[in-house]
Amino acid sequence: MIRSERGDQAYWDEWVEYAEERFQAVHDSLKTVAGDTSYEPQYLFNLAKGYWHQMLRRYSRGDAVSQIARYFPPLLDAWEEAERLGKSVWTETQQYSRHAWALNLDHYIVCFWLVGLALALNIPDDQWNRLLQLIGNEGEDALLDRVIASRQAGREIGTRLCHPQPYRRLLEAVNAPREKQGELLFTFVDNWYVELDRPAKKELSEKTAMYERPYWHRYGDQNFEGGAYFGRWCVEAVAAVKAFGIDDSLCQGHPNYPGDLLRPDGPGTHPLHSAQEGAGSGEVGEAEAAVKRSGWLVSCPSNSPAEPGEFFKD
């Protein structure tokens, strides 16, 4: 059963299979073709990004939750190699902007997603420890550090939220009396997508996020058939439920809540629906700009694997 409200069976089948083909093609090209090595770290990071998109894409299609965890090993391999090679390519400022939760909203959310997936899927300890090495940022966030600490004893907990909008609501749910947690969790999930559409910042500093909304926020609003859309899943809520034992019954069936991640053997939490192929409400040009920022619809030249491209059709 398709879990996403958007996209029919043909859409999800096409793009799940296309991604699998591209993964193999990218691995083959990395082994055989030489290119500008300065692009290789970003290219490898985009490969890692492709794996976490595929995890969520398969969830959206309705695949068995047990099939999702197999993407962690190649994801970690690609990300680790990107970081290794990037040390000689990225400047200190670039390294900071790529990794700092407070500055990089995209990185914060992706780390939250991967932690949530890792907890829900109970990945092995060796993979978990590799993931934590890549995530870093220990002691930087009052919420995500606590979630990670549910499986990493002794982790330093931050004293502030890197991104109060929308994550203050989730922290309130975590801190609430148990009888209030479920309702507050639902409030977070119900406002999560809208509140990530944040106003632009007038100036930048070390404490100011580079972008006002996540790179994927408008995926599907334009050129839905192009394949960038992989779902809009609040994995952060699943992470908190797994870490703190919050009652998620009010969230089950919400179009943004991936509750089946916590119930791999069923029953399913998503209602049957008439899937749309999805016209959206994004302003003209905004979705295209977000896609360019993420690299997901930029084709990689067949003779240059080191270009910072991605895997989907133009």
Regions found by a protein language model. Name each.
Residues 2-220, 229:
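Eukaryote-skewed repeat-based solenoidal scaffolds used as protein-protein interaction platforms
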Residues 139, 279, 292, 306-307:
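N-terminal functional modules and adjacent low-complexity/disordered segments of proteins
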Residues 294, 301-305, 309-311:
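Intrinsically disordered, low-complexity segments enriched in serine/proline and basic residues
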Residues 16, 160, 237, 304-305:
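Short linear sequence motifs
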Residues 119, 242-245, 310:
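Charged/polar positions within long, soluble alpha-helices
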Residues 183-298:
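Alpha-helical oligomerization segments
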